[in-house]
Regions:
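Long, Lys/Arg- and hydrophobic-enriched amphipathic alpha-helices
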Residues: 200-359
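Short glycine-enriched loops at secondary-structure junctions
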Residues: 28-33, 193-194, 241-245
Length: 359
């Protein structure tokens, strides 16, 4: 078969229309044609740049959060420091450097686990972190995490988990599915599949026809698993992504390639596919599991952790161009009209521990 588009078309011809989540899963993880198997997504030469690759300041603030959370939990020894979807290892590199600089005791107590399904990226991560002379445990599933106190980070991971979409038609919710028209192009259709009962049926009944609602069962399962684990072993987690604090409607499925948005049906497997994260649902799941949970905008979080103070330190004695770059990086990470407002930070813990104070 020549490409993923033809493979998906054949599936639809044989089995009928597919769900949005099936389409996303194939586009991202198909063993032969999937995006994560065939493309190089990260960095300026890739399809997108994540916050850790904009500036070391981002990872340093996460490192401060980790250390402060560890102290708030009573300085457990040993403890698990884990990241889900570590990319090229840039964020964990900055976190470990920060912890090592501020507390050798915490650094020695940390056992590093990177949850990564790409063998190529896992090798790159280990190579990047080799200088710390710590064993790097590369695992593919959260279930492989030992039962020690856990401090977990996931940056721009949740947006990649598949979603299903529902559209209101003539007062009823129907599932959006994908089929092929007479011209051989992918199109959305409304299929007679009801909105799951867990999706706030009463609230959803108030919206007009044409409204789209996105449901992300894998995100919700992930949140239940992490929250339950934290209650059992103690610890804290930090999930960072773009999305809304409150329940939101609309089609947020998007394709990105070479830093530009593309048609989601154009060349599946060659573009990154993501959607906005439903943070209100995730927070409620954490609370139901017995965790403390709070949502902050990324800019607010970074300022709380000492972004400006650290930036001033970093700029001392540096050239004017480098100082300008630091200011530009802060603007991009924390400004409300860039990443500061769109990106949210969900912090949750087994104890009533709010976002720790800066050092």
């Amino acid at each position: 078969m020549a490409n993923l588009k033809e493979k998906i078309k054949e599936m639809i011809v044989l089995n009928g229309p597919i769900t949005v989540s099936q389409y996303m899963t194939l586009a991202l993880t198909d063993p032969q044609f999937g995006y994560y198997q065939t493309q190089t997504p990260f960095g300026r030469a890739g399809d997108f740049i994540t916050a850790p690759e904009i500036s070391q300041l981002f990872g340093e603030m996460i490192g401060i959060w980790t250390l402060a959370s560890w102290k708030a939990q009573g300085c457990p020894h040993p403890f698990i420091l884990a990241e889900i979807g570590p990319g090229r290892g840039t964020l964990m590199d900055d976190i470990l450097r920060t912890i090592q600089k501020l507390s050798q005791t915490a650094f020695n107590a940390a056992e590093i686990f990177l949850i990564e399904i790409s063998k190529k990226l896992a090798k790159e991560q280990k190579k990047r972190l080799f200088s710390y002379q710590k064993q790097i445990h590369s695992i593919e599933n959260f279930n492989q995490i030992p039962s020690n106190p856990l401090f977990l980070i996931a940056n721009e991971f949740l947006d990649t988990l598949p979603i299903n979409q529902y559209i209101k038609v003539n007062g009823e919710w129907k599932e959006r599915r994908i089929t092929v028209n007479q011209n051989g192009d992918f199109i959305f259709i409304a299929a007679p599949h009801k909105l799951p009962s867990s999706c706030l049926q009463t609230y959803c009944s108030k919206v007009p026809d044409g409204t789209i609602f996105e449901h992300a069962p894998l995100r919700h399962q992930f949140m239940q698993q992490i929250s339950h684990h934290l209650v059992q072993v103690t610890g804290s987690a930090l999930l960072i992504d773009y999305g809304a604090c409150e329940l939101a409607f609309g089609d947020t499925l998007q394709a990105l390639s070479k830093h530009r948005f593309r048609d989601v049906f154009d060349a599946p497997g060659e573009h990154d596919l993501t959607s906005h994260v439903d943070f209100s649902f995730l927070k409620n799941i954490a609370l139901e599991q017995g965790c403390f949970a709070e949502i902050l905008e990324q800019g607010e979080f970074l300022f709380k952790m000492g972004l400006l103070e650290r930036a001033n330190q970093l700029g001392v004695g540096k050239s004017a161009p480098l100082q300008d770059k630091i200011r530009q990086d802060i603007e991009r990470l924390a400004s409300p009209d860039q990443m500061g407002k769109l990106f949210k930070v969900l912090h949750f813990s087994d104890k009533n521990i709010s976002i720790p104070p800066q050092f």
